[in-house]
A protein has these predicted regions:
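Thiamine diphosphate
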Residues: 1-144
Length: 144
């Protein structure tokens, strides 16, 4: 469903000048169309997930809608402090899109596993976790 999520993201960017994408050296292929259509609104901070989250928080504070994209494990665990302090506690509106759930990237080792994301996010009650199973689920979630 990565392709469908990228298409929905592109549609959001077409409909709103406020949407920005921040990635941490991931999304190649699936986000190429987004990057090509809106290079001035697409930011790749390199392999630096903490920076990605910090940039997104800063953008949100300036009134834009930041969307962070990364592998689920990298998106949640590496910038955890920023997510806890700003997105959860201060409720700064940052959208997070994670690729891969549970053991989808099993062959890459434990650093890529997101098998305990529900337990970790239970400590952050102001961050909603969605795990769409179908494209219809994804479309419904996207409307929120």
């Amino acid at each position: 469903m990565r392709r469908e999520a990228a298409d929905l993201l592109l549609g959001s960017m077409v409909n709103s000048n406020h949407v920005r994408v921040v990635t941490a050296d991931l999304g190649f292929g699936v986000l190429d169309q987004v990057r090509a259509a809106f290079p001035e609104r697409f930011y790749n901070v390199g392999a630096a997930e903490f920076t990605m989250a910090g940039v997104a928080v800063g953008m949100a504070n300036e009134g834009v809608i930041p969307v962070c994209y990364s592998m689920s494990s990298f998106l949640l665990y590496r910038p955890f402090e920023l997510l806890r302090n700003y997105v959860n506690h201060e409720r700064i509106p940052v959208k997070l899109i994670g690729s891969g759930r549970d053991y989808d990237y099993n062959h890459d080792g434990i650093s890529h596993w997101a098998h305990d994301d529900e337990q970790v996010l239970a400590a952050l009650p102001n961050i909603k976790l969605y795990k769409p199973d179908t494209v219809e689920d994804l479309e419904n979630i996207w409307q929120e």
